[in-house]
UniProtKB/Swiss-Prot annotation:
Record's protein name: Imidazolonepropionase
Gene giving rise to this polypeptide: hutI
Residues involved in Fe(3+) binding: H74, H76, H240, D314
Keyword line: Cytoplasm, Histidine metabolism, Hydrolase, Iron, Metal-binding, Zinc
Superkingdom classification of source: Bacteria
EC number: 3.5.2.7
UniProt: N-formimidoyl-L-glutamate binding residues: Y146, N316, G318
GO molecular function: imidazolonepropionase activity; iron ion binding; zinc ion binding
Function: Catalyzes the hydrolytic cleavage of the carbon-nitrogen bond in imidazolone-5-propanoate to yield N-formimidoyl-L-glutamate. It is the third step in the universal histidine degradation pathway.
Amino acid sequence: MRVDLTITNLSEIVSPKGKPPVCGKNMSQLSIRKNKNIAIKDGKIVYIGSEIPPALRTINANGAIALPGLVDPHTHIPFTGNRAHEFIMRLHGKSYMEIMQAGGGILSTVKAVRKASLKELVLRGAYALNEMLKLGVTTVEGKSGYGLEKTAEIKQLKALKLLNKVQLVDVIPTFLGAHALPEEFEDKKEYLNYLSNMLKDVREYTDTVDIFCEKGVFEVEESREFLERAKAMGFRLRLHADELAPSGAGKLAVELGAVSADHLISADDETLEAISKSATTAVILPGTSFFLKERFARGRKMIDLGSAVALASDFNPGSCNIYDPYLIMHLAVTRCGLEIEEAVTAYTINAAHILNLSNRKGKIEEGYDADIVLLGLNSYTEIPYMFSRITVVSVIKSGRVVFHES
């Protein structure tokens, strides 16, 4: 069989094991194939082994390691504007909620996004996605939530749909209209009813709804009513949960069968135990804790309880202006207690599971999409040690070499 591409001279081919989502102690189990080759045809991995099938193109990896293309399941692309001044405010002691209540935070980005054209959102988003691709991130979730009214929310969702067409990273959209209470509304219930009426229009762009369920934003009972409406319409559910305080949002995610509960920095033991016994994946975002100088989610406890854990960047203009996956993995290992094997599983197959893509992304296996990143390391175990200067040798997306260091 003649293939499109072969990758030879790989020191390690690293891939998660097990049926997704991979839970608890199984997250530390990786398939490590040493000194094997990969063959790709029609955008799919068709062979992994010692042979070198004839190919239209061959890459000599020169001892690099291969990981599945990384999957970032929680970002706030697309957005525009700059909130560097808020970073300085936080250094001077202002809290996230204090900045938000003063008209900064999410609402300042809302003003910028409402003014921006669709073209500007697409161009800004494409730039960020291209930079992420160079780091080996091949699939990214993006959210609305910086519009907070119908026209601007749909504009963000249109931008995500266009981004999925005009650049190489796969972009998976989520509706996060319930990100904050806009200035036009005084009553949260009234605003959530407004969003509920938008859902029929949103369905054209996404099958997933998210909400910022937090004390002072949308409380548990308010969130439950909105999410139940979305669920009744067939939407998959996600929650920003227990980020700033233990609010009950993580338990609500379990109750409603949400795909994920994200952040969980302030989740109590009872909440973590409930998540571990459910089908809800815990998403930890250590970059946000790092950026805000806050405590970190208890990733070690989540895994020890048996949860499926995913990692994500939370890339956004205010609380985490970071999209580097190797920094995120470093923080997961050094601050959240994960083993590097668990971090790899969390940023690949478990992340893909959240986006309903784990049947074709997040593993280097025959039949999976040929999304692969080659790193100039001796072993995957060097990722948290070398995180600030990892050489990305090549990125393969859908069987095409889309980035090469030379």
